[in-house]
Amino acid sequence: MQIEDRYITGWCDQCWEHFNRSIGQYKRYYKYAKIGITIDYRVRASQHERREKKYKWERMIVLYKTTSENNANYVEGYYQDRDDFVNKWYGWSHMSPTGEYYVYLLLGNHKYRRKK
């Protein structure tokens, strides 16, 4: 899986335009998309690849970095209920009492493959 560090920081209320634009641009090329949060996105990417093979995850875009667990959960929660995401798990994550949290976008099964 290709992992891209494209995160921004700051108050999540000031980042919505960036999130919406970025997510829309990336998603249009893939059949599957999933939004998530983690404290270690490299480990999380590996877990998704092993556990969710049917989605054929190809890219992980790290969108947001924050020290606030509430902000990370808020951003994830905003997107996970949408029909165009394949999020199955709902609820708040409690990952670490301190540290950094990352919101990521998973993309799988590219729509426009070039034929060889």
Write out the residue ranges for each language-model feature.
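Conserved phosphate- and dinucleotide-binding cores of soluble alpha/beta proteins
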Residues: 88-91
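GIY-YIG nuclease catalytic motif and its immediate N-terminal context
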Residues: 1-85, 95-116
